[in-house]
Amino acid sequence: MISGTSVQAQDDDRVLAIGGSVTEIIYALGQQDRLVARDTTSSFPPEAEALPDVGYMRALSPEGVLSVNPDLVIAEAGSGPPETIEVLEEAAINFVMVPDGYDRASIGEKIRAVAAALGVDAAGEDLAAEVDADLAEAEAAAATGGTPPRVLFILSMQGGRILASGTDTGAAGIIALAGGENAVTEFDGYKPLTDEAVTALAPDVILMMDRQGDHSAADAELFSHPALSTTPAAQTGSVVRMDGLLMLGFGPRTPEAVRALSAAFDEARG
């Protein structure tokens, strides 16, 4: 696996994009005509969904990837499994894993890495600078909103058990950029919480990925949960839902996500 961008890209390379933010960056760079396929998480822009889908980024099969005959695979960090990457390397396919992170600087690094893998470094510098300036403006505006609301990001509630974000996650990163305070700081990653722990966190806002459907019914069900029913968020009905890729992708659209979340947090403050 090539970590970084030492690949010598060719204009006629058949490129496979793995990871929604990688695909977005390729489109933002104007290099989409080189794409031959994408992974399941690559749902934006909408036209990307017309490309063949080789499967979920963390559960790729060698057969699925090889079926689209790529010369170059550009993947988000965490793509795999490792056994699949080993097979692709043995098949002499260039595999570039781009760095990931959950802050402003990391987005620029990711854009530059994708651009370098494609051999369009200058365009990458321009895009990185444009996104960075836009994000700096959005972040500064979000920081003027007053007392940061305590935000609990819930990844899932399967079986009534709340799986929440701690630190060092995309959710924690976007909450901070948008002027919020992550309610959970006791652990890294995503872990289940006891009902008592959720109640003690006293979140002002519940943040979730938008999975479509009837939100009014979903909100009622959410706040009927014993752990959430007495929280400040339940008392004000403050739940914010956003498309998962927009919110957690950390790519060219992150300034848009920050502005939308900041506005939602302002509304929650009243």
Model features per residue range: what roles?
Residues 19, 77-78, 100, 155, ...:
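Short secondary-structure boundary segments
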Residues 165-190, 210, 241:
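His/Asp/Glu-enriched short active-site or ligand-binding loop at hydrolase and phosphoryl-transfer sites
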